[in-house]
Amino acid sequence: GLTYTLFRPSVPYVCVGHQYLFLHQNFEFPDKNSFQLRMLRFFTKMTAVRSSKKLALSFNDMEPDRVEQVVVVPPLIRQEVTAIQPEEGNYIHGYMVNSGFADSVEEFHTIYPEVPLRFFWDKADADEVTRIDETLSFYQIDDVKFLNGMAGCRAYATTAGFESICEAMYLGKPVLMVPAHIEQDCNCLLYTSD
């Protein structure tokens, strides 16, 4: 957006991303801090300044918003995901964008030690696998292992990001979302709406 504002290239561009749904006139925002919501919309608008069209990725169907030039399209699912054959395992598969969330996972594990948990994280000083006990392990991020784990899990738990939630839903996995910030609050509301 800023490149097109400052340098005005002659080549048109199209923005693609789930966040462009926030610009759609019919998108319903959660009842959250109005300043944060305004900043979210402002930042999203800034990334799309002078775009010829915005493709908003979503599982929900919505009519095009001609004023904001937003067209809602299905999510982009990686070929690696579409090639996987899902199975129902006995464990909850998870991803933590911040390894600090491990405390919350361990707290849950203390209350429900019988529930097998396999969470992926990006913790620089951790081993490839950090095994807490028989039913709780943390794994370093590895795309292939992560997707195989998702394909074989019983359910998926993560913050309410976009891509991995879409992949889990594509594979038919139940999803638990724990939003960590305003954009994820919006995603959570979107996923739970009809």
Locations of regions flagged by a protein language model:
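Conserved small/polar residues in nucleotide/adenosyl-binding loops
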Residues: 191-194
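Short, acidic/turn-prone active-site loops that include or flank metal/cofactor-
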Residues: 18-22, 121-124, 142-144, 180-184
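Short, well-ordered alpha-helix to beta-strand connector turns
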Residues: 10, 51-52, 89, 153
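A donor-sugar binding/catalytic signature common to diverse glycosyltransferases
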Residues: 145-187
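Active-site-proximal region of nucleotide-activated glycan assembly enzymes
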Residues: 11-72
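An aromatic- and histidine-rich active-site surface loop
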Residues: 1-9
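Donor-nucleotide binding loops and adjacent catalytic segments primarily
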Residues: 72-155
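Hydrophobic/aromatic beta-strand patches that form the interior of the parallel beta-sheet core
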Residues: 14, 53-55, 71, 118, ...
